[in-house]
């Protein structure tokens, strides 16, 4: 038997249950993983609330790393004992997880399970945002909301690698220091300053080339106002709630702007893309070129508290669960 965090109904953190389940057997093309570290992400809260639909009961968890325990028929790319990591498959909030082999990547020997779980989803999100959704280049200016969060810290580092100037928004001086350490050229305390006014001041009224917005409802309108003509808003999350209905004609009046709502799954849909993005991120972690913050580690049984702290913005960097 194994322990797993499941939801049998949607709602608040109180619906998370620590259940005992049979250890599953891998079928054709599947791999059984003994989970050693689990990443906690906002996407799991969307499933918990019912924003994203799923069949219940559901074992939560979209990101994890661990050791290959058993191979299903037809799996040849991995061996028992391999350290592997995965994203995009629910089920990692558990002691064991079944994962399609095509969704797994091998973890370099210099990377720990904790580092892999901390880097995969948020690191690849940073990668696709900076390399594909809006291809950052030297001289570009980017506004990154939640600059001290898991994605924010990694996205800032990736953007700076590409030669971009990064402006971030954060809620406290402590988080501002972390954001600057990651490479942000300018940090705005949105609790004390109007970020739209500050961005206009910093850019001499020109606006930024791209806004990376994971906040949603409370930042969307002002984020649009921060863009230069023909700039792009990448709305890749909604931690403050979904954006209300919006008349697209407003984009013309604000400068022929572009808006996109990307998700990681469409940027790792092929094996080639998954290996490219995961390979880059894990290599950067292995060499120390990408710095991770993993100061918040909870036992698996405290998954509800981990989600409470995530949603309350009490944490910085990556939250992990330890089975």
Regions found by a protein language model. Give the residues of each.
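NAD(P)H dinucleotide-binding glycine-rich loop of Rossmann-like/cofactor-binding domains
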Residues: 37, 46, 83-148
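Short glycine-centered segments of the SAM/dcSAM-binding site in methyltransferase folds
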Residues: 83, 141, 165, 231-232, ...
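C-terminal hydrophobic helical "lid"/dimerization subdomain
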Residues: 272-323
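Glycine-rich beta-strand-centered segment in the early N-terminal region that forms part
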Residues: 22-39, 49-91
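Short amphipathic alpha-helix with an adjacent loop that forms part of the alpha/beta core around
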Residues: 195-205
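Mid-domain Rossmann-like dinucleotide-binding core that forms the NAD(H)/NADP(H) cofactor-binding site
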Residues: 117-193
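Glycine-rich phosphate-binding loop and adjacent beta-alpha segment
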Residues: 170-173, 218-289, 323
């Amino acid at each position: 038997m194994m322990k797993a965090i499941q939801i049998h109904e949607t709602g608040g953190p109180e619906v998370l249950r620590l259940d005992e389940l049979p250890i599953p057997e891998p079928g054709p093309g599947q791999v059984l993983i003994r989970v050693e570290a689990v990443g906690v992400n906002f996407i799991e809260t969307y499933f918990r609330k019912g924003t994203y639909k799923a069949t219940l009961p559901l074992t939560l968890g979209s990101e994890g790393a661990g050791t290959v325990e058993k191979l299903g028929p037809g799996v040849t790319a991995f061996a028992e004992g391999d350290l592997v990591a995965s994203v995009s498959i629910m089920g990692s909030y558990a002691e064991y997880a079944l994962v399609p082999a095509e969704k797994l990547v091998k973890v370099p020997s210099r990377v720990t399970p904790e580092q892999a779980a901390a880097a995969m989803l948020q690191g690849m999100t940073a990668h696709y945002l900076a390399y594909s959704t809006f291809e950052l280049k030297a001289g570009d200016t980017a506004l990154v909301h939640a600059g001290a969060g898991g994605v924010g810290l990694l996205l800032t580092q990736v953007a700076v690698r590409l030669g971009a100037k990064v402006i971030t928004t954060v809620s406290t001086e402590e988080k501002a220091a972390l954001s600057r350490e990651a490479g942000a050229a300018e940090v705005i305390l949105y609790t004390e300053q109007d970020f739209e006014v500050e961005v206009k001041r910093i850019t001499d009224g020109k606006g930024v080339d791209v806004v990376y917005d994971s906040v949603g409802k409370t930042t969307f309108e002002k984020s649009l106002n921060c863009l230069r003509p023909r700039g792009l808003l990448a709305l890749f999350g909604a931690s403050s709630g979904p954006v209300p209905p919006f008349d697209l004609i407003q984009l013309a009046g604000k400068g022929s702007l572009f808006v996109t709502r990307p998700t990681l799954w469409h940027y790792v849909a092929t094996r080639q893309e998954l290996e490219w993005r995961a390979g880059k991120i894990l290599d950067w972690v292995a060499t120390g070129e990408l710095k991770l913050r993993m100061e918040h580690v909870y036992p698996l049984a405290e998954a509800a508290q981990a989600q409470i702290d995530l949603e309350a913005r009490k944490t910085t960097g990556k939250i992990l669960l330890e089975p």
